[in-house]
Amino acid sequence: MKSGVAYITVQQFCTFHGCETLIIEEFMDHGIIEVQRQRDVVLIPEAQVPRIERALRLRNELGVNAAGIDIILRLLEHIEGRRWREVEDFEDFE
C-alpha cells in the first residue's frame, strides 16, 4: 500500500452503495478499476471511488456491460484530459 493514500474495503464500498461485491470483482477483472490487496482484503484507493461510482451508474442506469463501461470511461478521461490541455494552452496564450 502507498503511504498517505486513504483506502476503503470493497465490502465497505458495497455496503454504502448497496451493490454486490461481484460487480466490483467484475470491474476489477475487466481492468476498469485498480485495487490493492492486503492479505484477504481488497482495498480501493480513495481516488478510485468516483470512477467506480460512475461505472456503477453506467451499469445500473443505462445497462452498459463491463466492456462498454471500460471504453466509455477511457473516452471520457481522454476528453477531460484534452479539455484541461486546452485550458492550459489558453492560459499560456494570455
Over which residues does each language-model region extend?
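Arg/Lys-rich, alpha-helical DNA-contact motif
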Residues: 2-15, 22-25, 29-94
